[in-house]
């Protein structure tokens, strides 16, 4: 976990990994959209996004686990499913705390892992945003841009702000789409797997679909503001979905308890088992041999 957090920090806050310089056409209409401004000027700012992504599944897990623990029937099943981990002579980790730590810990790990995958994809591909040419401000009077079908590999042709150009080279996959769908799907899998409601059958579907719809609208907002291409958002959705499904199904096993495997019965010690006496069965060869021996003794006599 510490290594994952450290790697995410290097991707986000340092220049350790340089973005690939991808070429472009000076007259590419897909890269000439208006500049939407910084990320802080977006309708969904990074601060709001990260707070909602981290707080929503964590709050759902806390509320769900505490509610189930205080229901008698559910508490008994949880205690039967979970093992109690001894942490000392006088302290132990009860099933409620253990489930909360496990589910929130796996969620946090997946959040950092998704961020790493997204940053790695953006660094390796260097895919250009829809507003790249607007902030790049290439020198259209140069010989390279005079030809309409000339592919430009020289990154020095840009005359705009270098920091903005650097961010404009990070489009594939969409980080907002990947993180939002991961968080929404993880929370949805938890709700459908653990929370049981008999009073209202529409409560869980409405809550789950509302959560997924929020993630979907986050991706659409990136496209509508010309911050990402449609392909970037789709790739982000696929990446976040894959991470959430893997962790939910293969790591926490659909949020079920970790029952210990039934221990195999120990074989009985043969030294403590009394021996059983079986009747002796006389062999026909022994009988015939005894008769021949008796006859020979009679002849000698």
Please place each PLM-identified region on the residue numbering:
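N-terminal transmembrane-helix/juxtamembrane module of multi-pass inner/ER membrane proteins
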Residues: 1-106, 116, 120-133, 152-159, ...
């Amino acid at each position: 976990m510490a290594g994952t957090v450290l790697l995410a920090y290097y991707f986000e806050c340092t220049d350790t990994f340089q973005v690939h310089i991808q070429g472009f056409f000076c007259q590419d209409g897909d890269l000439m959209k208006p500049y939407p401004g910084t990320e802080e000027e977006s309708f969904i700012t990074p601060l709001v996004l990260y707070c909602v992504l981290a707080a929503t599944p964590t709050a759902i897990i806390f509320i769900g686990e505490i509610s189930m623990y205080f229901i008698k029937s559910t508490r008994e099943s949880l205690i039967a499913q979970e093992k109690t981990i001894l942490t000392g002579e006088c302290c132990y980790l009860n099933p409620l705390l253990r489930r909360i730590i496990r589910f929130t810990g796996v969620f946090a790990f997946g959040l950092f892992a998704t961020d790493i995958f997204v940053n790695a994809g953006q660094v390796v591909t260097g895919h250009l945003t829809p507003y790249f040419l607007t902030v790049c401000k290439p020198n259209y009077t140069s010989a390279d841009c005079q030809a309409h079908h000339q592919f430009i590999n020289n990154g020095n042709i840009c005359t705009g702000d270098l920091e903005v150009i650097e961010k404009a080279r990070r489009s594939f996959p969409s980080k907002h789409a990947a993180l939002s769908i991961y968080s929404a799907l993880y929370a949805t899998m938890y709700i459908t797997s653990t929370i049981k409601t008999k009073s209202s059958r529409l409560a869980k579907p409405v809550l789950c679909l509302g959560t997924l719809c929020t993630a979907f609208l986050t991706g659409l907002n990136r496209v509508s503001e010309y911050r990402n291409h449609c392909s970037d958002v789709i790739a982000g959705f696929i990446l976040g979905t894959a991470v959430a499904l893997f962790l939910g199904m293969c790591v926490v096993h659909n949020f079920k308890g970790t029952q210990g495997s039934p221990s195999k019965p120990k074989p009985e010690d043969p030294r403590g088992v009394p021996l059983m006496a079986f009747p002796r069965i006389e062999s026909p060869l022994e009988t015939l041999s005894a008769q021949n021996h008796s006859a020979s003794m009679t002849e000698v006599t």
